Amino acid sequence: MYNVLLYDFRYRLGRCALLTGGLLCAALFGGCDSGMAPSIYDPDRSSLPDPVIESVTPEGSALAGVDAVTITGNNFSIQPHENLVYFGTDRGDVLEASATQLRVFAPNNPQPELELRMAVVGAENFSNTLPYRLDPPFVEFGDVRDFEDISGIATDSGGNLYASLTAFGAAVGIIRITPGGERSDYLSSPFPWADIEFGPDNSLYGVRSVRAIFQSTGKGSDFQVFAVIPNRSTRLTTVTVDANGRIWAAGNNSDLYSVEQDKSVKMYEFEADVRDIALFDDFLYVAGLQDEISMIWRFPIDANGDLGTAEEIMNITSQYGSTAFALSFSSTGQLYVGTDGTDPVILIQPDRTGAELYPNVLPQVVRRFAWGAGDALYAATNSTEFYPSGIIRIATRREGNRNF
């Protein structure tokens, strides 16, 4: 009897709860308006005018990851972050902004063809598009394989590049690479050449860490001894030739050396581990180490071809924390310095102010330079974790200096 009463009580309680809940739902839903909810779209809202691009400077193209591009037009935001500028699918970094002009850093992604366009926060549509191009600031050159290594490099008057090549650790000789990148054998040699340079007679001169300077008179002509330094401890690792055919050479020695075409040798006391030498405007420039400090000096050359007193140009170690390995001049006197720094090329102006060339773009240690045709500066590079050693061609937008 007790169980029956308990069941009846629970049954009635459940029916009461269901009835109460049903009435509550009916009240709630019955009180709602069954009409359409109001739209959140504001038909009276006005958007900003769409941006318009009229011109871009530099016109047509820029260096990827290097140049700041100026965009002129209308309806830009004066807040840099509200202007979204696209080079193809890559956004550029807006550095400065006004209502009619933007200054934008080009992204580091070379593309031969792209559409340049932009949007402004608050405007409904993109701007018009302009065809544009992002050129590479450097390219790998010469099809140097992973098992090959390059030491000395030089160029001839036709813009061909010559390189001392080793393969699987064994010297092969000198190869010639045309401006178009086609390789061919120039001469064979069982030795790697630390540095090579053409003279005004089209002879190729070379040094290879001994006390002699060698000469090749043309394709297929093996290197022959041209001159020997009297000091038996001398080791020559860098060489250059001036317009008179005078050869300058140096290394980790107590002297600098000049050799005339009659093979007479002059020595100039200067103790340093010299990594490279270069000529410009009647001066001999020297990159070397003294007491583990990397420096650049210059020596005046008088009318008799003799060196004057050394003058310090720049302390590379203190200013950049790196070591200078290579020197080369533009025709207007800018000095390119190849180093082992994170940004491996330093550009020194005639007033002796310096700056890293193309920061965050050039990837490898630079060991040697040689000017090609036009604005092409070739560099022999060391291997890194991500890049094998080889040759790169840097777009400098300057003509190279020729000694003759």
Language-model regions, residue ranges each:
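Beta-strand/beta-sandwich contexts
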Residues: 33-78, 112, 123-144
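A short beta-strand motif characteristic of beta-propeller blades
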Residues: 136-145, 181-188, 221-230, 262-269, ...
